[in-house]
Structures are given as C-alpha cells and as structure tokens.
C-alpha cells in the first residue's frame, strides 16, 4: 500500500455553538453516490462531493438537522432510502437531499423495552428494514416498517455493534467482544479484547479487529502503595479475532497507540491502523513485516484525530481533526465508489416574462382589462359591509380522556352542570386586566376606586370555573420610559419580606424553583458561603467555552445574596441565565429555553423543570468538589439520600451495595398497590397522601432468576432489596407523573401533608416521635386550557417563610392561606417538585458590620489585577490600585460609572397605524467599569478601570456613548487589559458587602444591567439628588456639570473615569449646598436655566 498522500484538507464546520472539543462526531463514505458525510455535535449532518473538473476539491452538497434535538450525531449508516443518523434518543432517516423520511423515537414507536434510550451504536441486519441499536443497558431491534422496537436479552453497556452473517458482533464498554445470536436471543461467545475501554472495532468477512485502552492501577511511589485509582492508557496492540475458529489471533503491534482500525474493503488481509496523533499504518495480518507508515499533517494546536473512515472502493481515507477533515488517496480518480450514481441537482425555475413597466408617464389604465358586463367587486357598496362579532372557539378535547374506560364529569374542573355560562367575547379575553396599573407614570391619573377594583381582581384567589388572575402568565410592559416605569412594587404584597424575579429573560422558567431553594436555610448557606474563597479562572481554554469565567454555583450564590439585599425589590437572573445558556452541559441536558416557554406545552414545561432540578443539583455538587475546602456544608451532604441494596442468592453470598442520590424521583405506584390503599382507606378511614406513595418506593423488593444456575439445570431466584437508609436535611422530590396519574392526586383530599416524622429505621411514624420534616414548599404547573397548547402554561411556587405561605409567580409575590396553598383539588394545579426540610435551621446572611470578619473570606482581588491574558505591549495603566492601608470601611465613598454595548437589538411591534410598541428591550452587556476613590488623600484617583472580555455577538458598540471601539473586548485583537465578568463582579460585590457608599449618575440603570442590588442607604445618585419631582424631568450629567461646576464634559466619546469623577464633584457640590441651605434655591435656578437652554449644554 504505497503512494498514499494527503490530497485535501477541508474545513467541514466553520463554527459550532455551543463550543465543543469534538465538533465532528461521525464520518461516513456514501455507498451509492460520490458523497462524504459527517455529523456534528449540534445534531446537523453535512455532505461533500468532489468536482470532476477540479480533483481533490470537496464542495458542500447538503446540510440538514439529523436529530430531533440539538444532540450530537453519534453514528451514520448507508441505507437504500437515504442516510441513517443515530443520536442519543432517536434514529432518523433522511434522503440524500436532506428531506426527512422517518423519525423513530421512544414516543413514536412501540417501545415497551425502552430500546430507544441512551443509544450509542447501530447497524443494519438482513433486508435493511431491521435496525439493530445498542446503548446503555439495552440491545434491541427496530422494525422500520411496523414501527416496533423489540429488546434482546442482553445486559451491559455497548459501544459498538456490527454483524457477521446473521450473528451480531458487540463491543462493550469493558473491552469485551461478544458474538450474539438473534435467533436464540443469547450470547454465543465472548472474547476479552482489552482490559479497559474499546476505542474502535472493525468487521470484515470472518475477522474482527479491535483497539482500545488498558486499565492501570495508580501507585504512590513514595509510599510504595496503591493510590486507589485506575487510569487508562492507549493499548499498543490491535486485537484480532477469527469467527470461524472462534479464537483470538496474534495481535498486531502498534507502538504509537492504536485508536482507530479499519479493514481494506478490497484487500481483506490489509488492516489500516491510526493513532490519535495522526500516525497511519497499513499492515498485512498474515505477514506483519509488510507495513507502510504515514503521518497526517496536523495543526500545532490540534485536539487529535477523532474519527477515521475508508471509502467502499478502498481508494480514499478520511480522518477528522477538530472541525477539519483530512482526505488521503493514492490515485487521481475522484470517485469514492466504483460506479457512482448521478447526484440529484436543484430545480432551475423558468425565467419570468419581462415586467410591464408602469411609471409616472404611463397610466395604470394602459394595462387593459377584459370585457365585462357586471359590476366589479371593487365597486361593492359601503352600506352592504357588515361586521360580525367573533364567535367563541370550541374547547379542544382533553387528550387524557382516553386513558380510562369511564371518565366521570369533573365538577372541580368544569363547574356545576346544566348552568349557562355568560358569553365571553374574543376581543376581551378572560385574564386581561385593563384596570391593573402597569406604569408608574400612570399613578397620578388613577382614582382610588380603580386601584381597589384592580387589586381585588388580580389578587382574588377564588374562581369557580377558571384560573384566578394571580396564577396567570405575567408580562412586563414597556412604556416610553423603558422598564423602569413598570410598577413592579404593585405586584409584591410581601411588605419587603420576599423579592420577585423578572421573567423576560432566557430560562425564566427556573424562577419558581430558585425561589423554593432560596427559602431553604441549609441550601442557601451552602451556596452563598461558596462566594467567600476566590474562584476566578481566566485561562484561554476557559474563555473559549466560559467567557464569564464563572460557574453555576458562583452565579447562584450571587443571585441568592442579591435576593436577600433586594428587600422586596424585583431581581433579574441575567448573569445566571447567561451562564446557563452558554453552557454546553446545559445544552446536552436539555434545560435551555430561549423563547420564554412559548414552544413548551404542559408536559414539556413539567419535563424541563424536572430535568433542570437534576442538572442544578448535580452541577452544584460538581462545582463544590472542584473548589478548595471551606467550612460550609456541601450540597451532597445536605440533600444526599443514602440508599442500600442487598442481593441474596443461593449460589453466592449476600452482597450489600450503598450509594446516594440527590433527588427522590416519585412516580405513581402500581395499580394493585393503589387498589390496596383504597380498600384500607374505606376500612380504616385513612387518607391516601404523598407518604403512601413514598412508603412504596422507599423499601422495594425485586426478584429475578439466576441465569448461570438456570443454564446448569438448577434454577432459583435472586432477591434484591433496595431501601432508603437515611433521608437528608432537605428532601427534594420530583413528581414524574402523567395527567391521568395527577388526576388521582386531585381526588385525594390532603394528599400533600404539611409535615411528617421519620423513625430510626427510616420509616414513617406518628407525630412526636423521630425526626420531623416540614413542607418547605413546592413548584406546580398552572394549566391554562388544553395541555397540548404551547406557550399558554406557566410555573409558580408556594413557599413557607417564617410560618407564612407565599405565592411566587415570577415578579408577583403575595401571602396566601395554608388551606389554599395545600389544596390540590383544582384540575389546573399540578405539582411538579416538592421540598421538605428539617426545621430549626437558620440563615447565614452577609451583613456589612461583620462581613470582613468572616472566616475563609478572600478580598485580595480588590488590591491586584487579574487579566485574562498578560497586559498588552504598550498598555498604559491609568489607575492606581488600592493598598491595604486604604482598605474600604463602612461608609467609604467610591465613585462609579459603567459603559455597556448592545448584544441583542430591541424587538418592536409596528402596527398598521404607524404606532410602535416595544415588545422586548435591547440587551446590554457590561463592557467597562471604573471606580474612583471618594475620600482620602487620593480622592478622585481610580483604582478599578476594567474592560470586560466578550466573545459573543455585539449588535452596537454605542461608541459615542460608551467610548468602546470595535475589537476592544475581543481577547484576540484587543489592546486593552481585559478581565472576565466574574472578576469585576467580585470586586463590586466585595465593595458592596464591605459597606462602601456608591456615588454616580443614573446608578439605577447601571446596577440593573450589572445585576447588582445595592441597598438605598449605600447609594448616592446625583440624578436623584438634583431632581425636583414637580418638573418630572431628570437632568443629565453633562448639563449639571456645565451649570454647577462650570465645566464641559463628554465633549467626545464618553469616558467612564471622567463621568465618575464628575459625579463625585457634583456630590461634593450637593453636600456643600446642603450645609449652606441653598440647595433648593440653586436647584430651581438650574431648572429655570435648563428650560431656557432646553436642558442642553453648549
């Protein structure tokens, strides 16, 4: 096999979002056409074809989504009808033009064995209508004609699957190769190929070749003892198996570490072996001294070879490296197959006839009209136009009605029967609150009667047939004054005890769950205390996939602390949501929503919040393990449920396994168990509650036959018992139930118990004995109409805080009676996540008086720089860092100003009348922060002047207002010394908790965009200090500086240092006028002069 060389390098994927280390996840040469296929990590399939006139040049042919969700394409296969694509939970069949032919998921086929879940490999068998799929604990067959998935009797995780005649070849994750007979539904033979994992497997004729990893124990050489861990190294041998003789052959040595292996399709005695470092070797399996070695030309920063495939004619080899494809060949022929079929080209539309030009000199009457006798429709008389009132659309049939043979009339859902309902016009749909005050600027024009009527209608809880207004989806309205004019305080009735969360951001469906965990003292303390030690990663690899330089644990800690400091004011989850949206792990977990739940129906909304609950606790636990040790209690200790499994068998000794999980996934018990509870309920007059459900799942018995002894003719049972041995301080319960199962809960009065007690054996006991658990709250889904309707439903939470129950519906917060909170009889009220906790736990809030004395607190970042990369050559530092002698104290004055850029434009609705309505405001991203000393010998000298790195899209730099030029925030080309958002946020957060007083102009907008909540006692805003309410106009910084300081500022591009210094001087002017008693007189003179100059500085 001489003469091979690299003939082409193709950039298959130019950009991937979210960023992935392995964008190309599958490779395939077409068996019919001259096409090279690849799948990527976002679920798209691409094909490339060579041009006959330009050899070795590949051109894009098609690109289309090959999966139902943005999950990686695991594998691709040729099919007579197109290309098969495999993802984690589905199999797609697309034509080579990209048209979808069929999609097979667990929901679309009859899949009683859960075959189509957690898939990792597939192959075809027989005629091609049967697809063999394998994955985690599953091996099955998918009939494409009947849409039926059948499971095989096989256990173990599979990495590869192929076929030899009618026998399947299985490659497992533990390095074993199995021959599986589908006719007898059993394994024929097993070969231990590698002691570690399998990295690749190839089958040709009667031979099987594998490569993989070897497991090695780690040793502590200093103490000459095992360290207790296992590491994996690439195996330097290619394992060969002969299926005719049913034995292993002599392995092929490959010192560079074999990662990929393929048989030559035309020369079955030739094996192609490749390493991740790009070494290619052609070797004869019968004469291993005959070999040819080549090296792939890889880039210096290459992640390594990730895939290798060979064409059907054996003349081309393709290797994937990151986003690039390397094409190798030894011939000038451009065909991947011997007799390629012609490709289907796009249709070319026929040319349109030349247009008839009608301009000012040519009248429209010159076009001509056919002869007619009757009046034209345009001559319709105006008195014959009638407007008919819109009729009421009939309600859709509930899809859950088909689950039972007989469904009685639901009085709670539809009200009493045989009572006429008042007509409701579609022009004024129910739930619209025209009397509710939306804008602060409208307060003066409202009467007290309208205010009382609106309050009664919005916060009224009783509604006989419909959902009360307080549970409806809330929308933030925007006036000409922006979001600051929206009256958030009107919707908060907690008297400052709780803060609502805004819902016009991505992933706002998490608001209900965040409010619930915020009320758990142990959970709150563990998360917030993680902010004390410093965590500021800023390496290049961090910036590429995490430009904020933060973690979910850190952002949640900041969010909880801001919710405490808000004291009833609304809070944004902007930084938390942005980190979640940019996270690759969140995308793979399916917990990202960027359309404000408009694409989710009722089931989808419940599923995504349950998935997020799993993802949140798992990610927080992982983040805490990565951080250095602190004295705070860990999430896994607070919420970890201790489990024990005992396996008893006659042939082996009793085995005991222990483990833990963070969430109790509660489903509906079997029907026979519920029938038993119903009989006990009638006999003993006891209610069916959540404890009845939990009691079934906390101690379960299962049995199965011993396969080994059954094969020897001595069948017996193996009994397994799984039970909960310890419940945590905070118990989180997911209710993964269908609508039909939730209806059973609605019929159980008192299903949600306010408290329960656990004995020493972790079983429920009577009150007064054992450990006590109280209901902290729960998240429920509110259904507005049919469950299949998308974007109509929302999530709320009921939380008990200091003995009082509160309803949290995004930014609506109101107290509620315990009877109403625990009432689950409404058909539209469906619980999703329930949290119980042990009482007697206290919150550890950060107070300014004791903040600096907290153990493990690291404040070093405010005394040093922490750039993303080293300072650029020629960079001039125009600020002076704080020293330990200047350490901030309570009441220390600091002047601050921030600049922003627009990352997303505003969304407008333009009506036919020409009026414009703001649907969603533009999204601002922090670009620069400057902080100056406000007192002391160095007053006015900046000690923070940071530019924040931003790798995303920038819609508008706002250069004339922000002073930010294109490229200033790009770490690759910027001449500024950049820092991460997490770095500058920690500096401001430390200054806030140390008790510093912030001086600035228009700080409300700056703090809102930074997502920083500062108590009013620590804010000195010159826009409010120099403001007279009767004029209803706030003065600009530029105008105040011209009138009061006699200085001209902002003459060019804005400079945040200059603006902060000007605000500091205005504050000193205000203090001076206040001491002399001339403030009101001077302020009136300023407004008078402003009216003469139209409030503009020359």
From Swiss-Prot:
Gene3D superfamilies xrefs: Cysteine proteinases, Ribonuclease H-like superfamily/Ribonuclease H, YVTN repeat-like/Quinoprotein amine dehydrogenase
SMART domains in alphabetical order: EXOIII, WD40
Binding site for a divalent metal cation: 897, 899, 1006, 1059
GO biological process: mRNA processing; nuclear-transcribed mRNA poly(A) tail shortening
InterPro entries: Exonuclease_RNaseT/DNA_pol3, PAN2, PAN2-PAN3_catalytic_subunit, PAN2_N, PAN2_UCH_dom, Papain-like_cys_pep_sf, RNaseH-like_sf, RNaseH_sf
Activity regulation, short description: Positively regulated by the regulatory subunit PAN3.
Cofactor comment: Binds 2 metal cations per subunit in the catalytic exonuclease domain.
Cofactor: a divalent metal cation
Residue intervals of the Exonuclease domain: 894-1067
Record region (Disordered): 417-442
GO MF term (any one): metal ion binding
Region Linker, annotated ranges: 340-466
Record comment regarding domains: Contains a pseudo-UCH domain. This ubiquitin C-terminal hydrolase (UCH)-like or ubiquitin specific protease (USP)-like domain is predicted to be catalytically inactive because it lacks the active site catalytic triad characteristic of thiol proteases, with residues at the equivalent structural positions that are incompatible with catalysis, and it cannot bind ubiquitin. It functions as a structural scaffold for intra- and intermolecular interactions in the complex. The linker, or PAN3 interaction domain (PID), between the WD40 repeats and the pseudo-UCH domain mediates interaction with PAN3.
The protein's role, per its UniProt record: Catalytic subunit of the poly(A)-nuclease (PAN) deadenylation complex, one of two cytoplasmic mRNA deadenylases involved in mRNA turnover. PAN specifically shortens poly(A) tails of RNA and the activity is stimulated by poly(A)-binding protein PAB1. PAN deadenylation is followed by rapid degradation of the shortened mRNA tails by the CCR4-NOT complex. Deadenylated mRNAs are then degraded by two alternative mechanisms, namely exosome-mediated 3'-5' exonucleolytic degradation, or deadenylation-dependent mRNA decaping and subsequent 5'-3' exonucleolytic degradation by XRN1.
Protein name: PAN2-PAN3 deadenylation complex catalytic subunit PAN2
């Amino acid at each position: 096999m001489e003469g091979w060389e690299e003939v082409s390098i193709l950039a298959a994927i130019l950009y991937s979002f979210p960023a992935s280390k392995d964008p190309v996840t599958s490779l395939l040469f077409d068996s019919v056409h001259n096409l090279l296929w690849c799948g990527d990590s976002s679920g798209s399939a691409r094909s490339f074809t060579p041009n006959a006139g330009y050899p070795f040049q590949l051109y894009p042919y098609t690109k289309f989504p090959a999966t139902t969700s943005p999950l990686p394409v695991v594998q691709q296969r040729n099919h007579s009808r197109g290309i098969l694509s495999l993802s984690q939970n589905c199999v797609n069949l697309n034509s080579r033009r990209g048209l979808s032919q069929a999609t097979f998921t667990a929901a679309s086929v009859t899949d009683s064995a859960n075959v189509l879940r957690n898939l990792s490999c597939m192959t075809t068998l027989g005629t091609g209508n049967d697809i063999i799929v394998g994955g985690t604990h599953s091996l099955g067959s998918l009939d494409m004609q009947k849409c039926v998935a059948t499971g095989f009797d096989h256990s173990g995780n599979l990495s590869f699957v192929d076929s030899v005649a009618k026998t399947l070849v299985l490659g497992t994750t533990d390095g074993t190769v199995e021959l599986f007979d589908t006719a007898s539904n059993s394994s024929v033979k097993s070969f231990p190929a590698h002691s570690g994992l399998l990295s690749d497997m190839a089958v040709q004729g009667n031979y099987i070749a594998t490569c993989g990893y070897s497991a090695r124990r780690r040793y502590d050489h200093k103490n000459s003892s095992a360290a207790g861990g296992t590491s994996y190294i690439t195996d330097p041998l290619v394992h060969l198996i002969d299926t005719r003789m049913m034995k292993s052959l002599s392995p092929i040595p490959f010192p560079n570490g074999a990662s990929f292996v393929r048989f030559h399709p035309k020369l079955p005695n030739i094996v192609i072996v490749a390493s991740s470092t790009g070494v290619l070797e052609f070797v004869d399996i019968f004469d291993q001294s005959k070999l040819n070695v080549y090296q792939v030309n890889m880039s210096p920063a290459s992640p390594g070879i990730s895939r290798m495939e060979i064409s059907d004619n054996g003349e081309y080899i393709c290797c994937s490296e990151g986003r690039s494809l390397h094409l190798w060949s030894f011939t000038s022929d451009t065909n991947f197959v011997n007799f390629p079929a012609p490709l289907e080209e796009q249709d070319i539309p026929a040319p349109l006839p030349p247009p008839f030009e009608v301009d000012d000199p040519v009248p429209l009457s010159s076009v001509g009209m056919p002869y007619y006798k009757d009046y034209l429709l345009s001559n319709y008389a105006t008195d014959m136009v009638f407007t008919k009132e819109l009729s009421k659309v009939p309600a859709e049939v509930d899809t859950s009605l088909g689950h039972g043979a007989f469904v009685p009339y639901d009085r709670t859902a539809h009200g009493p029967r045989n009572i006429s309902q008042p007509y409701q016009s579609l022009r004024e749909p129910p739930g619209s609150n025209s009397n509710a005050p939306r804008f602060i600027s409208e307060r003066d024009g409202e009467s007290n009667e309208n205010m009382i009527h609106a309050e009664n209608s919005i916060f009224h809880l009783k509604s006989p047939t419909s959902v009360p207004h307080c549970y409806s989806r809330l929308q933030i309205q925007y006036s000409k004054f922006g979001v600051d004019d929206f009256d958030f305080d009107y919707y908060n009735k907690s008297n400052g005890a709780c803060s609502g969360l805004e819902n016009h951001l991505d992933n706002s469906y998490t608001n209900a769950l965040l409010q619930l965990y915020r009320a758990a003292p142990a959970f709150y303390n563990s998360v917030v205390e993680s902010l004390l030690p410093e965590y500021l990663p800023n390496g290049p690899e961090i910036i590429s996939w995490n430009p904020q330089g933060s973690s979910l644990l850190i952002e949640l800690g900041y969010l909880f602390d801001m919710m405490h400091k808000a004291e009833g004011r609304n809070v944004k989850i902007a930084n938390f949501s942005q980190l979640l949206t940019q996270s690759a792990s969140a995308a793979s977990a399916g917990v990202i929503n960027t359309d404000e739940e408009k694409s989710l129906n009722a089931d989808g909304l419940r599923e995504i919040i349950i998935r997020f609950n799993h993802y949140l606790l798992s990610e927080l636990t992982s983040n805490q393990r990565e951080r250095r040790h602190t004295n705070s209690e860990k999430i896994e200790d607070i919420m970890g449920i201790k489990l024990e499994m005992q396996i008893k068998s006659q042939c082996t000794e009793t085995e005991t396994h222990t483990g833990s999980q963070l969430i109790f996934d509660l489903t509906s018990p079997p029907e026979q168990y519920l029938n038993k509870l119903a009989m006990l309920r009638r006999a003993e007059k006891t209610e069916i509650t959540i404890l009845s459900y939990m009691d079934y799942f906390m101690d379960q018995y299962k049995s199965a036959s011993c396969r080994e002894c059954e094969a020897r003719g001595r069948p017996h049972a193996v009994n397994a018992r799984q039970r909960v041995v310890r419940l945590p301080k905070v118990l989180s319960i997911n209710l993964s139930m269908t609508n039909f199962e939730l209806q059973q809960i609605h019929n159980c009065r008192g299903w949600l118990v306010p408290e329960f007690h656990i004995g020493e054996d972790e079983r429920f006991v009577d009150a007064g004995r054992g450990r006590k658990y109280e209901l902290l709250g729960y998240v429920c889904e509110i259904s507005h109409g049919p469950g299949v309707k998308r974007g109509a439903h929302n999530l709320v939470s009921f939380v008990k805080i200091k003995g009082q129950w509160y309803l949290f519906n995004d930014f609506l917060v109101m107290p509620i009676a315990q009877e109403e909170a625990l009432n689950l009889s409404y058909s539209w009220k469906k619980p999703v996540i329930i949290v119980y906790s042990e009482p007697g736990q206290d919150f550890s809030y950060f107070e300014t008086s004791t903040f600096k004395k907290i153990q493990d607190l690291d404040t070093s970042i405010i005394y040093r720089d922490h750039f993303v990369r080293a300072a650029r050559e020629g960079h001039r530092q125009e600020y002076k860092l704080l020293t330990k002698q200047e350490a901030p104290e309570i009441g220390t004055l600091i002047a601050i100003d921030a600049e922003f850029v627009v990352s997303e434009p505003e969304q407008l609705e333009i009506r036919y009348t020409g009026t414009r309505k703001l649907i969603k405001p533009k999204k601002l991203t922090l670009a620069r922060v400057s902080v100056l000393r406000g007192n002391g010998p160095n007053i006015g000298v900046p000690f923070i002047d940071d530019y924040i790195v931003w790798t995303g899209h920038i819609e508008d730099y706002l250069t004339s207002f922000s002073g930010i030029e294109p490229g200033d925030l790009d770490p690759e080309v910027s001449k500024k010394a950049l820092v991460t958002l997490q770095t500058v946020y920690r500096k401001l957060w430390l200054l806030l908790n140390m008790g510093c007083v912030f001086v600035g102009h228009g700080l409300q907008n700056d703090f809102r965009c930074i997502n920083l909540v500062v108590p009013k006692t620590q804010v000195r805003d010159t826009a409010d200090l120099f403001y007279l309410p009767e004029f209803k106009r706030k003065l600009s910084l530029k105008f105040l500086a011209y009138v009061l300081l006699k200085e001209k500022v902002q003459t060019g591009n804005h400079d945040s240092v200059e603006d902060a210094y000007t605000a500091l001087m205005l504050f000193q002017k205000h203090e001076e006028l206040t001491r002399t008693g001339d403030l009101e007189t001077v302020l009136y003179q300023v407004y008078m002069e402003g009216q003469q100059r139209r409030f503009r500085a020359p």
